């Protein structure tokens, strides 16, 4: 399926995961303004990378394991206004971290990671890979962030609320810490079902975790004003 945003176009037909609200919110919410280098782990169609390219002047490196998704991602990059600042690497993040030429620090890392650690695999293999942590465990993801993140850099993720206990369990023994979390509420009156997270090295000066909420829709089904402000630079409707 194809999606047209204000400044770029996405074709995600050969990608395991289609363009969705999770990635759009993460791409609009991540604090990218000062970043000169950005790493997108599990780039898929390239949506997060393209949103980052629109929002800041950074050079963006996008790592995608699946070959079909990587081809779609490269196509989307080539047709964007920022092709000269977007670099695609078709490999696992583990292989990426081991390549000497890529052992550099990134000011910001962004990722909408696989989130089903257990359960029945999806029938479509690409979708299964995109949705299950079999292809990228939390531990492997945090190890990659630790290796690639600049000393004062941040990493932005979006996770299901039920994954937070596991994340915190791993962080307790990790050189990374959770410095910010924004609870994402689908509609007024509901409990949060997603969490936007910011990770940093434990040497980061900020210690206490900053906590906030974002509600996506009013009871009427319309986007809240907070959500509109977040996405207005991307959605044609606004």
From Swiss-Prot:
The protein's enzyme class: transferase
Family per similarity comment: Belongs to the methyltransferase superfamily. tRNA (adenine-N(6)-)-methyltransferase family.
Record localization: Cytoplasm
PANTHER family: TRNA1(VAL) (ADENINE(37)-N6)-METHYLTRANSFERASE
Signal peptide: none
HAMAP family from the UniProt entry: tRNA_methyltr_YfiC
InterPro entries xref list: DNA_methylase_N6_adenine_CS, rRNA_Ade_Mease_Trfase_CS, SAM-dependent_MTases_sf, Small_mtfrase_dom, tRNA_Adenine-N(6)_MTase, tRNA_adenine-N6_MeTrfase
The enzyme's E.C. designation: 2.1.1.223
Reaction it catalyzes: adenosine(37) in tRNA1(Val) + S-adenosyl-L-methionine = N(6)-methyladenosine(37) in tRNA1(Val) + S-adenosyl-L-homocysteine + H(+)
Known function: Specifically methylates the adenine in position 37 of tRNA(1)(Val) (anticodon cmo5UAC).
Matching Gene3D superfamilies: Vaccinia Virus protein VP39
Keywords carried by this UniProt record: Cytoplasm, Methyltransferase, S-adenosyl-L-methionine, Transferase, tRNA processing
Gene Ontology terms: biological process: tRNA processing
Protein's name according to its UniProt entry: tRNA1(Val) (adenine(37)-N6)-methyltransferase
Entry GO terms, CC: cytoplasm
Any one GO molecular-function label of the UniProt entry: nucleic acid binding
